[in-house]
């Protein structure tokens, strides 16, 4: 127990390293027996970027400006803040200028600009365009300094004051509503929802599974959270039609309801590669040479605003690591659970993962090894226990139990005999 453990597992610490591992033939049974690196002559352009933005540009859209203006509220909510502020300022300035010109024309036609002594003006103290502009601002913003005011001499002036007040209320309601809707958008909530850099393919409960990890960096919950996934690839129909992006649903438990998750700690999403899976006929070598993209989607309601948010990411074929599992991130302490996000994107290699397709595995064309290898998660738990004993100054020789006591620092993800630990999906 006191000896230093050697690292028998390769750790993928970055997306770049993961891509290298995914495209290289590994010598210990992962490759095809030849020291050959599989590369693609044509690499698929990513349809959904890692940050969730769709890599799509629209061209030749007829009457685009008119269509956007017809839905001006959504346009204002979707545009950037700097353009929103420009629209905000221009709307008020133009309305003030318009009604300032109207009051100046009323004064001009009534002869108020000539300053005649016996002439009762339509708007008192308005003898220039500047004065008319200031009166327009005072009317719409209800400042009312008291020097300029409308009189009962001109009914048209009274009507314009009433009309400007109504228009000002409409502008205020529209601008405030657009700003509030833009501020309340759950778009920024996606910044605290993360997907793992790489997806993995490994055995789970005796079946070959595709897995990826999702996490919530906030303590506030995502209500009614659920996940979806689609595989995008090009294909040619039996009639010869070329479909550049054929969308195929990937089952993550919709029928059984396990697609709905309680996202408090990081969770590994599992897709069982069965006969209904689009990955059923893919072996490791086929995966290395494949050209497709898996789009993963996490949806839920923001707890603070009850608005629906959607977080997206994608994995190309060279970002799927065959024969890897994720490092454990959830640990059980004395009175709480601890999540270590430094391990969130890291994976380790599982040497006995079959390299055949799920179909060959189901048809018994590949014989699984019966050798039980010591699981890496158990090694993490044992190492953590040793560190606790060193920190507390308890000598290992004083322990009478041949198995380490895992009560104080259990990894909540892997069974360890003879005292089983709770699995990550059960917490």
UniProtKB/Swiss-Prot annotation:
Intramembrane residue stretches from the record: 129-140, 141-147
Site annotation Role in the control of polyamine-mediated channel gating and in the blocking by intracellular magnesium: residues: 172
InterPro entries: Ig_E-set, IRK_C, K_chnl_inward-rec_Kir, K_chnl_inward-rec_Kir2.1, K_chnl_inward-rec_Kir_cyto, K_chnl_inward-rec_Kir_N, Kir_TM
Position of sequence motif Selectivity filter: 142-147
Expression across tissues: Found in the apical basilar papilla of the inner ear, brain, muscle, cerebellum, heart and liver.
Compartments (UniProt record): Cell membrane; Cell membrane, Sarcolemma, T-tubule
Gene Ontology terms: cellular component: membrane; monoatomic ion channel complex; plasma membrane; T-tubule
Segments on the Extracellular face: 107-128, 148-156
Activity modulation: Activated by phosphatidylinositol 4,5 biphosphate (PtdIns(4,5)P2).
Region (Polyphosphoinositide (PIP2)-binding): 181-208
Molecular function via GO: inward rectifier potassium channel activity; phosphatidylinositol-4,5-bisphosphate binding
Organism encoding this protein: Gallus gallus (Chicken)
Pfam families: IRK, IRK_C, IRK_N
Free-text function comment from the UniProt entry: Inward rectifier potassium channels are characterized by a greater tendency to allow potassium to flow into the cell rather than out of it. Their voltage dependence is regulated by the concentration of extracellular potassium; as external potassium is raised, the voltage range of the channel opening shifts to more positive voltages. The inward rectification is mainly due to the blockage of outward current by internal magnesium. Can be blocked by external barium. Probably participates in establishing action potential waveform and excitability of neuronal and muscle tissues.
UniProt keyword Transmembrane helix, yes or no: yes
Topology relative to the membrane: Multi-pass membrane protein
Motif (PDZ-binding): 425-427
Quaternary structure note: Homotetramer. Homomultimeric and heteromultimeric association with KCNJ4/Kir2.3, resulting in an enhanced G-protein-induced current. Associates, via its PDZ-recognition domain, with a complex containing LIN7A, LIN7B, LIN7C, DLG1, CASK and APBA1.
Cytoplasmic topology ranges: 1-81, 179-427
Catalyzed reactions: K(+)(in) = K(+)(out)
One biological process term in Gene Ontology: potassium ion transport
Name the record gives this protein: Inward rectifier potassium channel 2
């Amino acid at each position: 127990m006191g000896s230093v453990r050697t690292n028998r597992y390769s750790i993928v610490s970055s997306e770049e390293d993961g891509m290298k591992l995914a495209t290289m033939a590994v010598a210990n049974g992962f490759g095809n027996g030849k020291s050959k690196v599989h590369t693609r002559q044509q690499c698929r352009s990513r349809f959904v970027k890692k940050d969730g933005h769709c890599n799509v540009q629209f061209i030749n859209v007829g009457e685009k400006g008119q269509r956007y203006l017809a839905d001006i509220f959504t346009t204002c909510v979707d545009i950037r803040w700097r353009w929103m502020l420009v629209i905000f300022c221009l709307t008020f300035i133009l309305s003030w200028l318009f009604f300032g010109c109207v009051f100046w024309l009323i004064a001009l036609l009534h002869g108020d600009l000539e300053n005649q002594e016996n002439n009762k003006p339509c708007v008192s103290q308005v003898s220039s365009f500047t004065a008319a502009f200031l009166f327009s601002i005072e009317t719409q913003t209800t400042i009312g300094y008291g020097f300029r005011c409308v009189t009962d001499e001109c009914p048209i002036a009274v009507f314009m004051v009433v009309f400007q007040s109504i228009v000002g209320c409409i502008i205020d309601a529209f601008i405030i509503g657009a700003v509030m809707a833009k501020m309340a958008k759950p778009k920024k909530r996606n910044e605290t929802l993360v997907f793992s850099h790489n997806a993995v393919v490994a055995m789970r409960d005796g079946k070959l599974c595709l897995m990826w990890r999702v996490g919530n960096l906030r303590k506030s919950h995502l209500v009614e959270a659920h996940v979806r996934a689609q595989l995008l690839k090009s294909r040619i129909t039996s009639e010869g039609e070329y479909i550049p992006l054929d969308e195929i649903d990937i089952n993550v438990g919709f029928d059984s309801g396990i697609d709905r998750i309680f996202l408090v700690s990081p969770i590994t999403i599992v897709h069982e590669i069965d006969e209904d899976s689009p990955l059923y006929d893919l072996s490791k070598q086929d995966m290395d040479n494949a050209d497709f993209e898996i789009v993963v989607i996490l949806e839920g309601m923001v707890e603070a605003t009850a608005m629906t948010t959607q977080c997206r990411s994608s994995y190309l074929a060279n970002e799927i690591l065959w024969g890897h599992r994720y490092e454990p991130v959830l640990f059980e302490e004395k009175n709480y659970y601890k999540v270590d996000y430094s391990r969130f994107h890291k994976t380790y290699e599982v040497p006995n993962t079959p390299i055949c397709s799920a179909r060959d595995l189901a048809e018994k064309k590949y014989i699984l090894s019966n050798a039980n290898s010591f699981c890496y998660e158990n090694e993490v738990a044992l190492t953590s226990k040793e560190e606790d004993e060193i920190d507390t100054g308890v000598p290992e020789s004083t322990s009478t139990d041949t198995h380490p006591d895992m009560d104080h620092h259990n990894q909540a993800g892997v069974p360890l005999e003879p005292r089983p630990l709770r699995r990550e999906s059960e917490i």
